[in-house]
Amino acid sequence: MKESIAKVYRKTGETEIKSEINLYGEGKCDIKTGIVFLDHMLNLMARHGLIDLKLQAQGDLQVDSHHTVEDVGIVLGQCFKEALGDKKSIKRYGTSFIPMDEALASVSIDISGRPYIVCDFNFTVDKLGELDTELVEEFLRALTFNAGITLHARVLYGKNNHHMIEAVFKALGRALREAVDKDKRINGVMSTKGIL
C-alpha cells in the first residue's frame, strides 16, 4: 500500500514536539516523551495499528505531565489528519474490542471531520508510573479534536488499571488501522455528501 506520511513540529512555552507518521507502515516506533508509561502505550497503539511513528517531546514535566500528554495528543492528531490527505477510498469506520487478561476495552472511530469524543473509564488508581490516569482521556480528546474524528472508547470491565489502559491503546491502534484501510470499491470518499 502507498505510504501516507506526515510530519508536524509544534513549540509552545510548555512543550516542544516533533512527530512523523506513516499510516500504512509496519508498526515501527521511536517514541520519547519523557513519560515512560505514555511511551509504552503509544508503542502499543502504533504496533497494533501498523503505524510507523517517530515522536520526540520535551515538556515542563517538573510541573506535571498534563501539558506534555495533551500536546502529544494535539501533534499526533494534526499528523494523522495531514497524513490522511483527501481521505479517498478509506473505509472511514473502525471498531476494535481488545482483551488484556481480565480487562476488555472497545474503541470505535469515525473519520468524519466532526470531532467528538465519548469515554467510559473507571480507573481505580490515580497514577501509573508518571502518568495520571485521568490524562488518558485528555490525550484522546486532544487527538480526536485535532484529527477531526469521532471516537468512543470504553473499558467494559477489568481490575488491573495497566491492563485496562493497555487494552484501550491497542484497541485504538486496531480501530485506526481498520478506518484508514483503503477499499478500491470506494469511489471518492465514504459519504453521500461527497466530503469528509
Swiss-Prot record:
The lineage of its organism: Bacteria, Bacillati, Bacillota, Clostridia, Eubacteriales. PANTHER family: IMIDAZOLEGLYCEROL-PHOSPHATE DEHYDRATASE, IMIDAZOLEGLYCEROL-PHOSPHATE DEHYDRATASE HIS7. The keyword Amino-acid biosynthesis applies. It is found in: Cytoplasm. PROSITE patterns: IGP_DEHYDRATASE_1 (PS00954), IGP_DEHYDRATASE_2 (PS00955). Its EC number is 4.2.1.19. It catalyses: D-erythro-1-(imidazol-4-yl)glycerol 3-phosphate = 3-(imidazol-4-yl)-2-oxopropyl phosphate + H2O. It is an enzyme of class 4 (lyase). Signal peptide: none annotated. This is Imidazoleglycerol-phosphate dehydratase. The keyword Lyase applies. Belongs to the imidazoleglycerol-phosphate dehydratase family. GO terms for molecular function: imidazoleglycerol-phosphate dehydratase activity. InterPro entries: IGPD_sf (IPR038494), ImidazoleglycerolP_deHydtase (IPR000807), ImidazoleglycerP_deHydtase_CS (IPR020565), Ribosomal_Su5_D2-typ_SF (IPR020568). Pathway: Amino-acid biosynthesis; L-histidine biosynthesis; L-histidine from 5-phospho-alpha-D-ribose 1-diphosphate: step 6/9. CDD domains: IGPD. GO terms for biological process: L-histidine biosynthetic process. The gene is hisB. GO terms for cellular component: cytoplasm. Keywords: Amino-acid biosynthesis, Cytoplasm, Histidine biosynthesis, Lyase.
